[in-house]
Amino acid sequence: MNGTEGPYFYIPMVNTTGIVRSPYEYPQYYLVNPAAYAALGAYMFLLILVGFPVNFLTLYVTLEHKKLRTPLNYILLNLAVADLFMVLGGFTTTMYTSMHGYFVLGRLGCNVEGFFATLGGEIALWSLVVLAIERWVVVCKPISNFRFSEDHAIMGLAFTWVMASACAVPPLVGWSRYIPEGMQCSCGIDYYTRAEGFNNESFVIYMFVCHFLIPLVVVFFCYGRLLCAVKEAAAAQQESETTQRAEREVSRMVVIMVVAFLVCWCPYAGVAWYIFTHQGSEFGPLFMTFPAFFAKSSSIYNPMIYICMNKQFRHCMITTLCCGKNPFEEEEGASTTSKTEASSVSSSSVSPA
């Protein structure tokens, strides 16, 4: 084995010289230069500095403006709530431990950080699944006269939390575990060991199949069918141009969210699977650190995509920030009027960009 396994940790360095120490008790500066830990702490501070206000603003503006409280936007709000969980429960912990160079908060802190990171990522993934299914049902109409209502949105929200919890909770109760990874200042699922009594192998397979591959298959199926339906509708002119444009714009926004999720999380998933299937092989602490910390940037991109691509939300946000006035009233107002008209003819009653 090209690493050192201890009680609730695995460090990717053989302890031939006796230098390896528990990541819960000693700084891990023998793994990488101390400046790297300072850089990680600064990176996490930046994510908190941007992630908290932008997600809180998304939540506040949507609750403040009644016209934004549409069923589909409930799912988008769910993404903001999940991101806030990651920022407050995970990022603050990681920033603090990075500043100390080891997981100074101990096992409890590791469980908290690992849980919130996993929960937030899974809520985001399953929210994208619900959005993809909604787009498929509304645009492709496999169910005639279907309208995505508030009840459907609430069921979708409950579904995302149940599925995310089914992935994030088991390591807290003995099916696998959360341990420090990479530079030992952030925590994740134990892909590294076959520790007795934790059944890591079965959990990792369960997680990859049920909480990564199956959701992605559903998303790709829905958008594959959606692409065909949009082309057919455009060719046949079955619906008004306004309705088609509204549906296309909503679908485009959700597709970009899916692509951004894949860009952020696939490197982490790929490295984790490699480590799991090559347990005991040699790799450095940065091998997992880079994709793990890159994945954390997902807390920023969803609200940014929403703000950039949803003119109605952007108008409401500017109005809120400018004390009820929009200095870009002519431009944003025209866009909002156009989009409100498009929304009124959309069978999903959403607010597209």
Swiss-Prot record:
Which residues carry the post-translational modification N6-(retinylidene)lysine, per the record? Answer: K296
Q: Please verify whether the record's keywords include ATP-binding.
A: no
Supply one GO BP term: G protein-coupled opsin signaling pathway
One annotated Gene Ontology cellular component of this protein: photoreceptor disc membrane
Q: Name one GO molecular function term.
A: G protein-coupled photoreceptor activity
- Renumbered to this chain, region (Disordered) spans 330-353
Tell me what this protein is called: Rhodopsin
Q: What is the primary gene name for this protein?
A: rho
